Amino acid sequence: ISSSQIAIVYADGAIVDGEGYGADIYGNTLAAKLAKVRRNDDVKAVVLRVNSPGGSALASDVIWREVELLREKKPVIVSMGSYAASGGYYISCGADAIVADKTTLTGSIGVFGMFLRLEDALKNKLGITFDAVRTNTSADMGVMRPLTGTERAAIMRSVDEVYETFTSYVAEGRNLPLEKVLDIAGGRVWSGTDALALGLVDTNGGLKTAIAIAADKAELGDKFRIVEMTEAPTGFGAFFSGFMAKVKADIVAGEL
């Protein structure tokens, strides 16, 4: 029996910061899992199964960097599920090959920022108001007052910087001119068929196709076994995770 393995690592859910398990992709947790297979000499190739609408830019970048380190040691193939958009594409774009179903929703190469405001809700609903004493005009920036023009401009600069990073990663990972990436970016969503024509993915197919490509790139022939890297929740955790995944899938389908 061959000791050579192809590891399947699942990235399923919204991408969030930190560590944890459940219906989301926790950036540090997934990065640690990828580091684990990178250090395992029995694992000769990795299939990263991505089914995500995106999420945190920071967590996406943490995962992207670990994918880059993994690629230095062994082939990494991405298999896209129903959707791999925004951060889902961010963590995919550096792989050695990307496989998407024809109906996969992908791309959405874009960045946005949100800033919660509670001032009106607290004042109008609860009668709560706040006064502030501050050392400078932005010291009390938060949910209790509107952003100033300077603060809004600073947040916009941060969004622009993340967008520039995202598009440069796509250009480098997909070997595309940056000008072409900018033409197809801007948050636009593409089907797997369109993504293939645009160069955002390498072929249309499912998980079996991705495994076959991984075996070929690692020169394994048919002498390998598949290992699934999962830490599945049990009991109520399994029920709740499945329920939340269904809710998020319905929301994404409605938005896209």
Predicted features along the sequence, with ranges:
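Phosphate-binding active sites in nucleotide-utilizing proteins
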Residues: I15-V16, Y21-S52, A57-L58, V62
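Envelope-exposed proteins and targeting segments
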Residues: S4-A7, D42-V46, D96, D222
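Conserved catalytic cores of soluble enzyme domains
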Residues: V50-V189, D216
